[in-house]
Regions:
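Long, low-complexity, charged/polar intrinsically disordered regions in eukaryotic proteins
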Residues: 1-28
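Short helix-coil-helix linker/hinge
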Residues: 34-39
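Hydrophobic residues on short alpha-helical segments
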Residues: 42-43
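Catalytic cores of enzyme domains
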Residues: 130-258
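Short acidic, hydrophobic short linear motifs in intrinsically disordered regions
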Residues: 50-64
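Short, amphipathic alpha-helical interaction segments positioned at domain boundaries
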Residues: 92-133
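Short amphipathic alpha-helical interaction segments
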Residues: 64-80
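A short, conserved structural fragment
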Residues: 79-90
């Protein structure tokens, strides 16, 4: 098998809408997490889909000589490890997609909040890869931003602020149907580097399809709408903002503070 398969996968990941800049650091992260066979299979996943839009096994197996069951088992194994996204397609079938920057990469390494040798190694590798240049290219060099900060409803002053209804967290929560909470990747990384955050760790909210993914794969835990409101309210009380994914239907909110 081609010995540069991980470099090929890094290039594949770099051309997505919210892709990861192609650097040696990314190649090293991929080598640490994907076997050559797994990298070859990940290369089959399209780069043109928007985040959280999976493709079926049938669609993938049509262009592959691999056994269909082996392909399905490998993709599910990668999803269980948080290396790719898994969810339902519009037809209701199970499908898979690549993680995109800010939509699972590198967050999935830390959502569980584990302190393990692998988590510590990933912390060092991720921080080395996401230097200032790479971070700017991944998140600041695109017309469509992965995140935006939105106000918490009761903190609004309508006399001085004009905010559309969908920009209010209460509305986001009202419109969602399933809720999950995971550990904040930034705070987990800080703790693993010996700089523990004084704020709560389980504050990364996920909704609907993304909530399904985290709950089904053990990356986060299911909560109620009211429990999500409590997390948002507590964030407001300590002066944190809420970052929302830029999607027509919100999938995640992350509480951030100084």
């Amino acid at each position: 098998m081609d010995q540069d398969i991980h470099d090929q996968l890094a290039g594949h990941l770099s051309v997505m809408g919210m892709g990861m800049p192609h650097r040696e650091g990314l190649v090293e992260i991929l080598k640490e997490n994907f076997t050559e066979q797994e990298a070859q299979i990940a290369l089959m996943l399209p780069t043109t889909n928007t985040p959280l839009k999976p493709v079926t096994i049938e669609a993938l197996s049509g262009s592959s000589t691999l056994d269909r069951n082996f392909l399905a088992d490998t993709l599910e194994y990668l999803a269980q490890r948080g290396l790719i996204y898994s969810g339902k397609t519009e037809s209701g079938e199970v499908g898979y997609a690549l993680h995109q920057a800010g939509f699972g990469f590198p967050q999935a390494f830390f959502w569980k909040g584990e302190d393990s040798p692998h988590a510590r190694k990933m912390t060092k590798m991720v921080l080395k890869y996401f230097n200032r240049e790479v971070t700017k290219e991944a998140f600041g060099g695109k017309k469509t931003k992965a995140y935006r900060y939105i106000p918490i409803n009761r903190s609004l002053n309508p006399e001085v602020q004009a905010v559309l209804p969908h920009d209010q967290m209460d509305t986001v929560l009202d419109n969602a149907t399933r809720f999950a909470v995971a550990h904040c990747p930034c705070r987990v990384e800080a703790g693993l580097m010996g700089r523990p955050c004084e704020h709560p760790l389980e504050v990364c909210l996920k909704f609907d399809e993304m909530a399904d993914y985290l709950i089904d794969h053990g990356l986060g835990k299911e909560i109620t709408r009211e429990e999500a409101r409590v997390i948002v309210r507590k964030a407001a009380e300590i002066g944190e903002g809420v970052a929302q994914h830029s999607r027509d239907q919100a999938q995640a909110a992350r509480n951030h503070g100084g």
